[in-house]
Amino acid sequence: MSLADRTTFKRRLDDLGVTVTEGPRSACAELVDEAAGEPAVGVARAAAELPDRVETEPTTADLREAHTGVTAAELGVAAYGSVAIEADRAGTEPVSLFVDRHVVVLREADLVPDMPDAFEWLGPRARDESSDVVFATGPSATADMGGLVHGAHGPKEVHVVLLRDEEADGDAAGESGADGDAAGE
């Protein structure tokens, strides 16, 4: 991941109306807590990084009532502002789709510049048939019903929590921006 990829990703997310919050991995639970509305559901595999108020073993009723779904993304595609959401037994895909707000947790190190790089990452998973992945780009929008409608086939809002590795914070200490976030690795 380069500074250019990070900058491009953030610019594309902004173009799509997606909010981005950045911070170190150690602050993940706090950042998610600030981004998530009530009630919130999430997937168990990210439980160590989620605030206690996020239900990590949601029932169907919990999912129906949830305002926010919190998932991890396996990959981010900078050129499109897309995130790779895995369809797994933990329920990542439904938690990302059946809510008004989807909070996506993505490690900065998991950003790639473009789709050829994303397909290179996806190739072994597809060949092994070990993974189903959806590339999601921004909030749900459709014009199937006449005018543009948001939230008909997925979340109305998307919020990305972009996490830096702790080592990157130390390496970039002299390259901080005005808001105190590291400018690159």
What role is predicted for each listed range?
Residues 1-185:
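The feature marks the mature, well-folded catalytic cores of soluble enzymes
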